[in-house]
Amino acid sequence: VGLDMKIDALVNMWGETAEICAGAPQAEYAAALAAARKHYLTPQAKEADIVIANSFAKASEAISGLMVAFPSVKPGGDVVLIANAPDGQATHYLMGPFGNSIAGKLQLQMKVPDNVNRLIIYNEYPEIASGRFLEDSEKILMMEDWEKVKGLLKQSHGPVTKVAVYPDADIQYCGGIN
């Protein structure tokens, strides 16, 4: 039994449906891909003192927002990942960790790049699973109070600070995809 129809929805930064593509699978896929490339394409910020990457659409897989954030920060800059997921991070059975010493066959452990001063992971619902997708580093701070996040950034950065904000970094992309 094959598919005779496929439906894809593109969402906006509030999680609302912004566009729907439907039709025969191959034709619909091509149309949805073309629409998604335009819809989610984002100019890449460069040399920002602070990069704020909100993972909203896939808050339970927040780490994906760092792929847009890390290339945007200048040496010595800070990255803030908003991983505000009340249910915590999803168990990823192929790439995720299971405790301290067991993981999926393709375990993903992202390294905080050398040029990043701090990676602040903000989640008002404290949990430790967010950090398990990252190599251990003293650069990583887990914070649950947004006012304290802002206070820490203000201490480190002066009044003339270049800030890049990705409102939905987990589904945005910065070119380079054919």
Name what the model sees in each region.
Residues 22-26, 45, 63, 140-143, ...:
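Electropositive phosphate-/nucleotide-binding environments in soluble metabolic enzymes
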Residues 5-7, 32, 51-53, 119-122, ...:
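Generic structural hydrophobic/aromatic packing signal, biased to beta-strands
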Residues 1-47:
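Conserved, well-structured core segments that form the ligand-binding/active-site neighborhood
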Residues 53-63:
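Short, glycine-rich nucleotide/cofactor-binding loops
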Residues 32-41, 63-69, 105-107:
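Glycine-rich, charged/polar anion/phosphate-binding loops
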Residues 2-10, 41-48, 79-84, 91-92, ...:
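Flexible, glycine/charged-enriched surface loops at secondary-structure junctions
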Residues 66-178:
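C-terminal non-catalytic interaction/assembly regions of soluble proteins
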